[in-house]
Curated annotation (Swiss-Prot):
Function recorded in the entry: May help in the organization of the PsaE and PsaF subunits.
Any one Pfam family match given in the protein's UniProt record, by short name: PSI_PsaJ
Protein name per its UniProtKB record: Photosystem I reaction center subunit IX
Topology with respect to the bilayer: Single-pass membrane protein
């Protein structure tokens, strides 16, 4: 039961960190390449 409580307290923290870093990455990509339908480095 203690392991389940530990998992339930760690999973929201990790998912929040993941979504915040993903959102920051997408924001920076859109800042460097605004309105990019095709990326020039491919």
């Amino acid at each position: 039961m203690r392991d389940l409580k530990t998992y339930l307290s760690v999973a929201p923290v990790l998912s929040t960190l993941w979504f915040v870093s993903l959102a920051g990455l997408l924001i920076e990509i859109n800042r460097l390449f605004p309105d990019a339908l095709t990326f020039p480095f491919f």
